[in-house]
Structures are given as C-alpha cells and as structure tokens.
Amino acid sequence: MASFPDFVNENEIARSRTIGELITPTSPFEQKYGRENWTVAFAPDGSYFAWSQGHRIVKLVPWSRCLKNFTACSTKNGVNLTNGRLSRQNSDLGQRNKPIEHTIDCGDIVWSLAFGSSVPEKQSRCVNIEWHRFKFGQDQLLLATGLSNGRIKIWDVYTGKLLLNLMDHTEVVRDLTFAPDGSLILVSASRDKTLRVWDLKDDGNMMKVLRGHQNWVYCCAFSPDSSMLCSVGAGKAVFLWDMDKYTMIRKLDGHYNDVVACEFSPDGALLATASYDTRVYVWDPHIGSILFEFGHLFPPPTPIFAGGDNGRWVKSVSFSHDGVHIASLADDNLVRFWRIDKSYPVEVAPLSKGLCCAFSTDGSVLAAGTQDGNAYFWSTPKYVSSLQHLCRMAIRRVMNTNEVKKLPIPQKIMEFLTYQTM
C-alpha cells in the first residue's frame, strides 16, 4: 500500500516550508490523556489565533505578533516571510481592541472552538421593547469553546472574560461553527447525536434542535451565505440542512466510513468532506454529486477495508480562501496540499500525531494541531488564480448550481461554472 498513485514520484512532490510552531508547556508528571489539541482557529479578521492546549486550556494569541515572531526566526535563517495582507488587516483594529494574549481555563477538556464576529446593524426607528443581558456591538469578537461535559462557554476575545455558559448537550461538544453573516448564530455538534442552534444576540437562547444523525456528530459547517449547514458524523453520515426552515435538504451518500470533517469553499459552490475511509470528497452540495476525489491510500481500498482500521484515516480538511487549494491531514503522518484540478498533492509536510488543520484568514498559512497539544504552521502553495476562476467564484457566490443551469449559455461555460471542468 502506498500514500500516492503509481504515476506520482513521491520524491518530486514539493515539501511545504515550516514557518513556526507553538509548543505547549508540559511537566514530567502530566498525564498524556487530555493533552490533545483537537481544534485550531483563526479569527475572521485575522487578528487572533486560538488553539486548545489540552487540560482545559485555550490559548489566544495576536496573529500578527505571532507571525512576526515566526518571521524574525526565519529571517535569521535567511528566509523572509513577511505577510503584508495580515499586517493591513490588524492595523485597522481600533486601539481599544488592540489584540493581547489570553490564557483561558475552560474548566473541562476542550474539544472544539470557533470565532464569531458581529457586523454593523441598521438602526431601527421603532421603539425596541426587548431586553437582553448582553448587547453586542459592531466590533464584537467572541470565542466559543465546546467542552467534554457538554457545555459551551462564550468568551470576549478582547478581555478574555466569560460571557455566557450554554447548557443543553448531554455529551461532548465535538464542533462549533458561527454563521458568517454576523448574526452570531452558533451551531454546535455533539456526541449526543444532535445539532443545536443558539442565538447569542438573544442571550444565548437555544433556538432549535436538529435531529437526524443516528450516531455521533463530528463536525458542522455553514455555507458562506449562511443559508445551508453541513453536518457529518459516524455511520458515513453527511447531511445538508436548510437554515431558514431548519429542515434537512438531503443526505450525501458515498463515503465508506465515519465522516469527521467538512468545509464549504469560499463561493459556496463546493463542499469538502474527510472520512476515515482514506478519502476526501469534494461535492456539489446543491445537487449532491461528487466532483473530485482525493485518495490517501493506493491502490484505493475496497469498501470493506476502507470501512475499517486501514491506517490512513483522514482526520481533518480545510478549504483555502482562493477556492483552489484544500489541505488534509491523515494518519500516515503527512499534511497534504491539493489543488482541485489535480488528483495528487501539490505539496506535503510531515506531521506526527496530527488531529486538525485550518487555513489562515488570507490562506497564506496552514495551522495544524497534534495529540501533544502543540500547533505547527506551514507556508501554503503559491498560486495565482486565473481571471476565469475569479469570475466563476464571483458568479457562484450569488448563484447555486440549479440557477446556473438555467442560464442561456454554451455547454462548455456551463460545465466550467459548475466545476465539471477546470
């Protein structure tokens, strides 16, 4: 069994450049259980990076400062990694909300975390007779942490203070995701087989319970327009939900083992799912078809072997902001960078005991967490998107597949816009 197809020479695949690492301090008496870094996340504005260090601790670090430290170390070795885009993002933050480092004790093992950001709201001329304990401003940045005891804690990122304690799940909160429209709607996925929808602008009111999973729910992700939610879990489950009606749209069939991670492309036209069956599938979520398959074991395993302990479980997947690159992390101690127009990785990086990965806000860096509670960072593949692809993304942000198919356009353009051709 091999990690790459026969037509690919592993030695010719480029190695991603490591730019830094954040190591969790340990003591000789510390137990290994509970040290896992189950999740890493970047703030939507690029101001913060957060990771679970294990043993109840979440670390919040200003990303620009962290990147400068990496750059300083790399410059000493003759490599310049200055990132102007992140620097500009952080310079826009007001002095009042200048990022500072926080260490948060969540009170229990942290399995998931997510950043949530509010947006400016239109001022209503009507008299508001509602009362809320918390009134979030237009520059609010929150961190949600999902715990082993089923609780969700909401923190103010700028102060590190606890704001809300959400209690309704009965098992581990395995994943969290905020609606990207600034509504501060939070969805949680749990081992209790449910997804729960919370309204943080209504003091964390639990709005809805989404039922349908027969086993653990591992991960959930909003589409960029917040209209659709994907949830994945044990038993090969991939579900799509309408977040206006809170109903299931469809189930996606194709995986042969537990599905543990999912993420939409920036234009919402594609959905990537990672499974223990050694595969990452890229779907068209609007019609439920598989467009691309990225294998991590060759020759491809049979359904019976893929459904068991095959040694190539894919643990995490992340979509870059360019809509072209995908990162995956598997049990063979490799991080892979894929391009959706190629069936093999364009770059790889060694990583032992990896559990999770996420692209930075601008896609220039990939972060990954490990069983030891550490976080590692790589420079991502350099690629200039074609004008055609940028136009496609602009169109797909406002039109789903069914709407595109109704356009009076040539077949070749239709296939390009629906990602059937690259």
Curated annotation (Swiss-Prot):
SUPFAM superfamilies: SOCS box-like (SSF158235), WD40 repeat-like (SSF50978). Disulfide bonds: none annotated. One of its GO terms (biological process) is protein ubiquitination. Pathway: Protein modification; protein ubiquitination. PROSITE patterns: SOCS, WD_REPEATS_1, WD_REPEATS_2, WD_REPEATS_REGION. Keywords: Repeat, Ubl conjugation pathway, WD repeat. The SOCS box domain mediates the interaction with the Elongin BC complex, an adapter module in different E3 ubiquitin ligase complexes. This is WD repeat and SOCS box-containing protein 1. The gene is wsb1.
